[in-house]
Structure formats: C-alpha cells, structure tokens
Amino acid sequence: MPTVLALETSCDESAAAVLRLNNGCLQVIASRIASQVEKHAQWGGVVPEVASRLHVEALPHLVEEVLQEAGQSMARFDAVAATVTPGLAGALMVGSVTGRCLAALHALPFFGIHHLEGHLASVLLAEHPPRPPYLVLLVSGGHTELIRVGAESEMVRLGRSHDDAAGEAFDKVGRLLGLAYPGGPAIQALAAAGDSGRFSLPKGRVSKPGGGFHPYDFSFSGLKTAMLRLVQALSEAGEDLPRADLAASFEQVVADVLVERSLLCANDQGLKTVVMVGGVAANRRLRELMSKRGQEQGIEVHTAPLRYCTDNAAMIGAAALQRLVSGDDASSLELGVAARWPLDKTEDLYHSPPPF
C-alpha cells in the first residue's frame, strides 16, 4: 500500500501527516498540527520571521509524533512530500528542506506540492469524495478562486479575487470590530447573535475594460471600505456599535457573493457538482447557504471535512499520493521554494532542472 510522509509549513501552521492508499481509498494514518495563532494574535496577523522560527521549533517534534503514531519507520515509506509554493518563503523553506533531507537520507522520491493543489485534494479525504468533473470554490486567507477540475484531474481557473481574498477580508473586518485574530471564527461566533439584514453592504464586481463585469470574479476591497465607513459613521453619531449586526451583515454578503457566483459558474459550465475547500469553507453560514441554493438548483455540494479545511499536512499527502500512484515524475531534490507560483504551472514543479 503506497504510503507518504507529508509536511506543511506555508504560513502559520506547522503540520505533518502519514497517509496511505488502501484499495483506492485515502487513509490518514496520523496527522498533527502545531498552530501559531496565539503567537501571532498579539500583532493582529502573521509575522513571517516569527512564523519561520516557530516552524523550525515545531516540525521535528511533529514528524517524530506522526511516525510513532503510525508505527512507521522511514524505510517503509514510498515518498516524502512538502509544500513548496505559494506561501511565506522562509516558512516554506523549513518544510521543504526537512522533506528533501529526509527523502535524500532514505533514498525516497520527493514531491514538492503546490499549496492550492493540496487544498483541492482535501475533499478527497471526505468519507464520500466527489468524482470529477466538478467546480471548486477555493476560499481561504490568501486565495479566493473558482477552479474547474476535469475528469483527468486537470485544473483550470475560471474566477478569482482581484484584491483581498475572502479570508483576508474576514481578518481585516474582525480587526475593525475589535475581534481576535483570526477574524473568521470570531466573526462567525459574534454573527450568530446578530441581524444579517440590518445593514445593506455592496457585492463587489470586477469591471471588464470594454464594459460589463467579469461574471465569476470577486472583489472584497469595496466591502471592506464600506464596513470601515459604516463603523466610522456609527461611532461619530455616538451610537453603541452593534457589532453582532455588523458581523452578521458582513458574513451574509460574503456568503451571498461566493454562493451566487459559484453556482452561476457551475451552471454555465454544465457542472452538477460544486466543491468547497479552504479555511473559509468552514464557515457555517457559507456551508448552509451553498447547500440550500445548490439543492434548489439541482447542484450537488461537497465540502472538505472541517478538520482539513484549514492548512494541514494531510491534504498535501493526498495530493502527493495521487501523483505517486499515477506514476508522475517526482520533484528534483534541487527544487527550492517560491512565495508565488501559478496553479496552471504546477507541472513545472516536477521538471528537471526545477523552475526555482
């Protein structure tokens, strides 16, 4: 049974996992995550240098823990995988160097995984994973994209955010409302007691040069600015800030926009399945609204398991196992890391010489 050790250190989560493919089913044998959220909360966001140092401290222990839990020695693995792009360069380097060293020491193939490919693979860890073709709404702190996954697992981006990602907007609005970092869970908790219809907020559009709008693209900067002005106006009027209503109204309009454009894109593409992955896919209002609207339109909705929505190593292992069993080439041990790399150039990560 093909088995991989996977590592993830692209931002503020150190993670290691052991995965196995058993009769065509992905099995997570062991998975560990060391979150840095509390460390970064005092600054209201991720500090790259601090993140890198914490990865260096945490990752060796996580690797040891998953090996012990899996009862697996390195000699029994078929490959090692690590996230190499996109992300914070210093943070990526910790996982990449660790993975490449382990692969070299034990004469194992190394798979440098694109972080977004990992998120796309996270839905395969569900009890009943969808079968392609389908449309993926990848919505996280750094990315908001609509990606068509074809029958041969080919990936084509059909829509994207032109400014802030949805998760980034949650963080910034959370800070505006005086909430703890990260903003997503804090806004969800506060919004539960609020009136989502109290405030009218804009659904950002992206204009085309020749007129009209990009139908599947997103823009959250205008929404963020509208929230800022609304909070300022309420404060200047001497009113107590209705934080729960503000949070609920913001959360609702984000969910509305994501659902409307995802389902429009799926219908236009003739796709009957929509998949949600990424940290924001854990949002309760978004999940409920997508399921409700999808059912009304005859579209099946799948979401990655909650524990695999945020950054984790299991999704990286899932992507690596897909490549391993498909007979794809492994990455060069000379492969470095890149803060940015387009998803449509993922195959370059397996070329020799490597692209970076």
Curated annotation (Swiss-Prot):
Pfam family, one: TsaD
Binding site for substrate: L138, V139, S140, G141, G142, D171, G184, N283
Keyword annotations of the record: Acyltransferase, Cytoplasm, Iron, Metal-binding, Transferase, tRNA processing
Binding site for Fe cation: H115, H119, D311
Cellular compartments per GO CC: cytoplasm
Enzyme class name: transferase
Cleaved signal peptide residues: none
EC number(s) from the headed UniProt entry: 2.3.1.234
Catalytic activity: L-threonylcarbamoyladenylate + adenosine(37) in tRNA = N(6)-L-threonylcarbamoyladenosine(37) in tRNA + AMP + H(+)
Required co-factors: Fe(2+)
Main location: cytoplasm
Cofactor binding note from Swiss-Prot or TrEMBL: Binds 1 Fe(2+) ion per subunit.
Family: Belongs to the KAE1 / TsaD family.
Name of the protein in question: tRNA N6-adenosine threonylcarbamoyltransferase
Organism, as annotated: Prochlorococcus marinus (strain MIT 9303)
